[in-house]
Every structure is written in structure tokens, then in C-alpha cells.
Amino acid sequence: VIDQETKHYYQAGFLFIPFGIYTAKKVTKKISSYLPKGVEHLNIRVDLIKPEENKVIISDDRELAYDILIVASGCRIVPAEIEGMDGEGWRKDIFDFYTVEGSTALAEKLEGWKGGNLVVHVAEMPVKCPVAPLEFAFLADWYLAKKGKRAGTKLTYVTPLAEVFTKKRTSEILGPLMAQKNIEVVTDFAIEAVDSGNKVIKAYDGKEVPYDLLVTIPTNMGDEVFERSGMGDELNFIPTEKHTLKAKNHDNVFVIGDASDLPSSKAGSVAHAQAEVLTENILRHIEGKELLPDFDGHSNCFIESGYGKGFLIDFNYDVEPVEGTFPIPGIGPLKLLKESRINHLGKLAMNWLYWNLIIKGIKIPFMTSKMNLKGKKL
């Protein structure tokens, strides 16, 4: 395993740090604590990949040969892609919560918040965990009300989408909930620049949204090494076969998680579902067998809605989120597309499940890599 980091993060927990629900310590562990015995961890940066030569060049100029390369490099925020975003206002009145540093700095900012225009903004799609910006808006509404500061805050949600979410049925539920919580929604906002001097975000069509505090999800991109290596698309994501997880242009390269260009969500649940398919296909590749087209884009996402409640959605490439029960068909105990206390508790339970079961590859009962259509109102 080549990884320039020594720490691993439960990234879904970053959402809770700005509101004092989690600390950075709760979402951070040493990588070395989770690698199986016999697995070597090279704590170093990858500078270049030569897929035609089956070689990886690392930052000390060593060349490492491979028979199979598994890319699990994730994606990253790149605020520099938006004019003015990472300038004078960065981490002063412009913040992200997609990094542990950003979410920790934002916690301090929110603690001293006096009121004004709080704008939650998505720069462009795709982004990691596409429900997270919505969750932040809902939690900000709850948090500011708890602090007695909601009445003095105008809360605005700005998205490049035509609706609040990528899935229509979910938008039909969450859009009205935004209105109910007095969160203004600005859709179809294609950002051109951030004017941090005047505290305004500007769209290409001339629309402007003023802010006192901008919580943004900047452009998400794959690792720069794929641009240098000629392996990525315009956002440095690797073109990947959507059902087998093999890189489209390289027969012995496989991709898991956020590093691919797949039309599935960039989310932990997706990577978890992919892992089973990927493991089987790597074994089949070694044995010279045809790869199985078994990944169906399965994703399930908890959506925090504030005040100790949440939603849960379950979908794949072809099936939109629908009502039903999860994970046990007909029993639940979780309800799909319904706001409930138990869905919120399920979201919180994922932290323990992640560190103790999921990351260790321990199978969770009733959790399947493919979407189970039983118990759903299709």
C-alpha cells in the first residue's frame, strides 16, 4: 500500500465537527492500525504512473513494478479552480468542511457567529457525498436555533443543479423541507468567481449571492498524478468500466471509490459495495477468467435533517430512491425516504461500524453489495 498519509479519516464525520458533535480525534486513526499483517505500507508520494510499463514512480525516484494496480486515491477539494475562492477570505469567512482542517476551523468560526448571511454553496458536480451540503444546511439551521442565533441569520443554499439534489424523488421531499426551515434555495448557479472583498459569489449568467460566511464545497478532483500520467479525464478521474471496476484503458488497473469517473455517488457506502465486486474480479483476473459485471452502482446515504432526525435513501444506477424498509426487507428497522429519529441514530452508529467492522472487511448482516429490491415500493 502506497500512501503519503499516516492518518486515516472517517470522512463522513467531518460534517459533525463544525457543530461540536464530533471532534477531529473521533474521526482520525493511524493507517498502520488497520493494515493486515504482511501488508507493507510505503509512506511516500506517488509522482508518476507508467501504465504501459506497469511501473509506479515514487517521490524518492524509485520505480516499483506491478502486475495489478488498484487505485484508491479518492478525490480532493480544489478551491483554486474557482477565481478568488482561495484568496484573502479563505478560512476567514470562506470555509470548507470536506477536510479535517476546514471543519475544525469552521467550528471555531460558528462558535463566534453573530448573525448575517450564511451561504452553503456547491461549486460543481460531482462532489464527494452529494447529500453532505444539504445536511450541513439542515444542521446549521438546528445549531443556530439552539444558540439563539437563527433569527439573525439568513440561510441560503446555492447549487449548480436544477433541484436541491441529484435524485428527483429525494428533491421532492428535501426541497419543501428547505422551505419549511426557511432556507432559501438558489438553483442553476454556475459559479464564475468569488469576490471576497465585497463578499459576493458571482455566476456566469450575472446572478450574485451575498455572504457574510460562505461554506463552500469547491470543485472536486482526482489526484494530480493521473494528469501527469495521462490516465485521468478533465477532472483527473480515471475512466472506469461501471460494472467491473476495471480501468477502461488499462487491463490490469482497477479503480475503487472516489477516484473513478463512475456515475455513482462518491460515497463510503459505494466504495464498500464496490469492494466485494472488486475482490472477486481481481481474483478472476489472476485466474484469467472473464470479469463479472456485478457492480450496480448501489449507494445508501443517511441524510441528517437536524433536531435529532434524519432520512435514509437507497438507490443504484437504474433505481431511484424509493420508500421502503432497510436493511431487512419488510422489517427495517430503518425507513427509506422517511424522516425519523432512528435514521439519525443510524447515522451516528456508522462511526463505530466503520472503525470496528467496515474498514476491517468484516461483513455486516443484511448489507449487500447489490441493491436489494425487496421491501421497497417500486
Each model region followed by its residue ranges:
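Residues at the starts of beta-strands that form the adenosine-phosphate
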Residues: 117, 152-155, 252
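FAD-binding core/adjacent interface of flavoenzyme oxidoreductases
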Residues: 39-135, 139-148, 215
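FAD-binding beta-loop-beta segment adjacent to the flavin cofactor pocket
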Residues: 236-254, 305-325
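C-terminal auxiliary extensions adjacent to catalytic cores
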Residues: 312-378
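Beta1-alpha1 glycine-rich phosphate/pyrophosphate-binding loop at the start
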Residues: 1-40, 124-168
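A Rossmann-like FAD-binding core segment of flavoenzymes
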Residues: 39-56, 64, 145-240, 290
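Internal hydrophobic alpha-helix adjacent to the cofactor/substrate pocket in enzyme cavities
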Residues: 142, 271-297, 303
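FAD-site-proximal beta/loop scaffold in flavoenzymes
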Residues: 77, 81, 87-114, 198, ...
